Amino acid sequence: MKQVLQIRCKNNKKTLEVPIGSTLYEVYRAFNLKMDFGPVSAKVNNKVEGMNYQVFQNKDVEFLDLHSASGVRTYTRSLFMVLCKAVHDLYPKSKVVIDIPVSNGYYCNISIGHTVTENDATRIRQQMQSIIDRALPIRHYEATTEQALNMFRELGDEAKVKLLENMGSLYTTYYKLDDYVDYYYGSMLTNTSQIKLFGVEKFFDGLLLRVPSAENPAKLDDFINQGKMFEVFRVHHRWQEILGVRTVGDFNEAVKQGFANDLINVSEALQEKKISQMAETIANKEGVRVVLIAGPSSSGKTTFCKRLSVQLLTCGVKPVQISLDDYFVNRIDTPKDETGEYDYENLYALNIPLINEQFTALFQGKEVQLPSYNFQTGMSEMKGKKLRLKPNNVLIVEGIHALNPMLTKDIADEKKFRIYASALTTILLDDHNYIPTTDNRLIRRIVRDYKYRGCSAQDTIRRWPSVRAGEKKWIFPYQENADAMFNTAMLYEVAVLKAQAEAVLEQVPEKCDEYAEAYRLRKFLSYFASLPFRSLPPTSLLREFLGGSSFKY
């Protein structure tokens, strides 16, 4: 008699019996599900697995397609492998580095003995399409870590060797596409034919690889020129090359050799130098009366504002900070979102006419009565402090809409200095596994929310997609308006956040939907050596999340 087990499918809320050892693909077909953009992977007991995963016990299963962030990650990783194989096929002695998430794509540094040309981009794109058209299986293997290390040593992949050496895992998974072998952090597609849409084009001196978005998997994300952000990444990468710490494996090796404090001190000094240079630029730029600072959640904007204010004072400029929260319109006039809830992230939740009227008056030397928003009554009250700017004063305005031209539409551009601040993670796991900048910020937020706001990691993870949607709508479209960009990420920070983040993430129960993301983040953290945060200076930006800052928040 054939042995069977029970599978509960979250997609259609049905339960079926399937043979023991069935793959997720076989389970999917048994449920007779239809997904236009999938399945690409599945959550098995709230843990993401590839579709070739076999089930040997009763499980809860939720199949994922390209409408999910996890599904897009699986698709993107698989496309990275196709790209790496295509380049390897055409240029056997080449090197590919998946380097920078930028311009709604991924910048790839391709070393092929000469600068990448349009013809190279065309050849690589055609070779990728050929690999996809051949419907090649992407096979999943498991070996002892020692065997995997020997294999990658023979392949000359030192970045992977360094990464795996420091993990301490007994076994390691890897993937094979035809004759090409690689390691990827997370689930993969099972066949290249599942890749329906991608773009490859020459970008600066490399390639830009483009993928569909979860919002609309039927089309590629529109190209956005993010030259300023690209340059920020490039500057940090050059600095990391000088230090010899380009990947997590390099970092772990440096920690093992006793250079942790050096990495912390240099990272902090670099940030302070950038802030000092920015303050000097503001002080020396004639006519600047307001500094506008925007950036996504958990970028460390509050500490950045305080450190910038200190440096401005050393330049003879006295900053005056104004909170945009005090410019909220009355709650009854606040726009609502698609669910009917008040949308406080909407630009028009702010009293734009009053902002422009008062800023104009201040720059003319007039005294104004600032508003004060009463969060209990939901009313704007003219009970704030009275303010008149002196000649050496400059306003500091921080908020999600600070770079939106509509916020200060009546203020002349020469009076503004705009800064975009975000945690732009520049260290790589290895050459083919980049670190999403959103992971850095989410880990910061999980630690801060638990420590200071009484929120569990489960709550923070649950709200994160809504936070990201607001950023995509209100912040990212205006980031290239900035006169300067400041990278708040630091080379060592994940290692310092690790202990506190792991402790909070381990509290997320397996039975909840957020467990999949918590598990993914725990796996990500496992790649890093752990560092104590005692040696951080009291002005460190990370103190905003970890505590112990000399600034008052």
Language-model region placement:
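Auxiliary tRNA-acceptor-end handling modules of aminoacyl-tRNA synthetases
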Residues: Y53-F56, D60-R73, K95-K273, M278, ...
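Conserved NTP phosphate-binding and transfer environment spanning the P-loop NTPase/kinase superfamily
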Residues: E286, P405-Y553
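Hydrophobic anchor at the beta1->P-loop junction of P-loop NTPases
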Residues: V291-I293
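Conserved lysine of the Walker
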Residues: K301
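Hydrophobic positions on the alpha1 helix immediately C-terminal to the Walker A/P-loop
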Residues: F304, L308
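Short beta-strand-centered segment that lines the nucleotide-binding/catalytic pocket of NTP-utilizing
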Residues: T314-I332
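Conserved nucleotide-sensing/catalytic segment adjacent to the nucleotide-binding pocket
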Residues: V329, D333-F375
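Glycine-rich phosphate-binding loop used to anchor ATP phosphates in small-molecule kinases
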Residues: N356-E414, W464-Y478
